[in-house]
């Protein structure tokens, strides 16, 4: 017995032509093609590798000792920040650093909202319910999600507000947010 991959449409077609319980795909195809249905001895399929079905080990995000220190000033020259991909990457990285520095106070970010927008949530679904175009992203390994569908200036304003909620001075918050 050989195994082949077929697309969903073909699979549904073959399955819809099943006439009896336990009928194999080979039997169905033989019947549909007008070929002789042969009684084949039950064979045990050999185990094959299915990379798409195997678990993928996700690489642990790079953590900066600077970000772990818990001092806002150290976020200004964090060497890991320039290595992040784009404004969204830097935005998420800084939010993750802040969560790791202040995990117990971080739920204060849930109060940050736009006039008709929800920026933070503890579930992807809540952000999508509030705005289907929110493009929710999880903040590192935290239980928090943020709407990433904002322009860079708005991301900076949101980050600045997060920093101030966590106790950062306004001028320093502006310097850190400017790095997004």
Curated annotation (Swiss-Prot):
This is Negative modulator of initiation of replication. One of its GO terms (biological process) is negative regulation of DNA-templated DNA replication initiation. Pfam families: SeqA, SeqA_N. Keywords: Cytoplasm, DNA replication inhibitor, DNA-binding. Homodimer. Polymerizes to form helical filaments. HAMAP family: SeqA. It comes from the Bacteria. GO terms for molecular function: DNA binding. The gene is seqA. Negative regulator of replication initiation, which contributes to regulation of DNA replication and ensures that replication initiation occurs exactly once per chromosome per cell cycle. Binds to pairs of hemimethylated GATC sequences in the oriC region, thus preventing assembly of replication proteins and re-initiation at newly replicated origins. Repression is relieved when the region becomes fully methylated. It is found in: Cytoplasm. Residues 87-88 are annotated as: Interaction with DNA. Its main location: cytoplasm.
């Amino acid at each position: 017995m050989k195994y082949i991959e077929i697309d969903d449409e073909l699979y549904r077609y073959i399955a819809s032509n099943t006439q009896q319980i336990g009928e194999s795909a080979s039997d169905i195809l033989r019947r549909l093609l007008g070929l002789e249905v042969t009684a084949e001895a039950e064979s045990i399929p050999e185990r094959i590798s299915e990379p798409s079905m195997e678990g993928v080990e996700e690489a642990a995000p790079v953590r900066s000792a600077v970000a772990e220190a818990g001092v806002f000033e150290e976020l200004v020259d964090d060497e890991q920040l320039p290595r992040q991909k784009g404004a969204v990457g830097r935005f998420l990285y800084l939010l993750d650093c802040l969560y790791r520095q202040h995990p117990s106070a971080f739920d204060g970010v849930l109060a940050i909202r736009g006039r008709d927008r929800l920026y933070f949530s503890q579930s992807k679904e809540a952000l999508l319910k509030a705005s289907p175009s929110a493009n929710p992203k999880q903040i590192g390994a935290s239980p928090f999600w943020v709407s990433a569908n904002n322009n860079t200036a708005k991301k900076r304003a949101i980050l600045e507000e997060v920093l101030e909620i966590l106790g950062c001075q306004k001028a320093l918050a502006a310097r850190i947010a400017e790095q997004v």
